[in-house]
């Protein structure tokens, strides 16, 4: 149990339902994990800007979640996951609430992050979105795991 906080530093989370704080703007939502681990203000500013740039989120850093589209909210959620520079990102149905174009773009972003050295573990019901991408797919069917 004492290792949980250090493990959390190495894991980023992306959820289907975003889990953004409605009373905080985009910048502060992404900065939250850095505050939790005790980063100073200058490092937070730099890393948040870098994470938002990485996910292609420009111009709405002072907007609040209710002002964003579903695709924009998911990009903010992904920026919050990568801002700590984790070794692993757990993505639980990250495309579930997105239109097909936004879902495709999000999977491309996850692939880019993976190509930069971060392991991505993504749960998805949308097999057509992930098949043929040259990635390992493990299917859970009837309680059994099947690899491809």
Where are these regions (language model features)?
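ABC ATPase NBD coupling module
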Residues: 1-12, 41, 113-115
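Hydrophobic anchor residue at the start of the ABC signature
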Residues: 78
């Amino acid at each position: 149990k004492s290792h949980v906080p250090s493990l959390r530093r190495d894991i980023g989370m992306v959820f289907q339902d975003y889990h953004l704080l409605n009373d905080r703007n985009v910048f502060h939502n992404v900065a939250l994990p850095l505050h939790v681990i005790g980063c100073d203000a200058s490092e937070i500013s730099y890393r948040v800007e870098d994470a938002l740039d990485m996910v292609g989120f420009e111009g709405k850093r002072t907007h609040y979640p209710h002002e964003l589209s579903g695709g924009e909210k998911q990009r903010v959620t992904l920026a919050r996951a990568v801002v700590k520079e984790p070794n692993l990102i757990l993505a639980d149905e990250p495309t579930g609430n997105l239109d097909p174009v936004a879902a495709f773009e999000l999977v491309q972003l996850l692939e880019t992050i993976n190509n930069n050295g971060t392991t991505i573990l993504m749960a998805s019901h949308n097999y057509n979105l992930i098949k043929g991408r040259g990635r390992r797919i493990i299917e859970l069917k009837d309680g059994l795991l099947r690899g491809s």
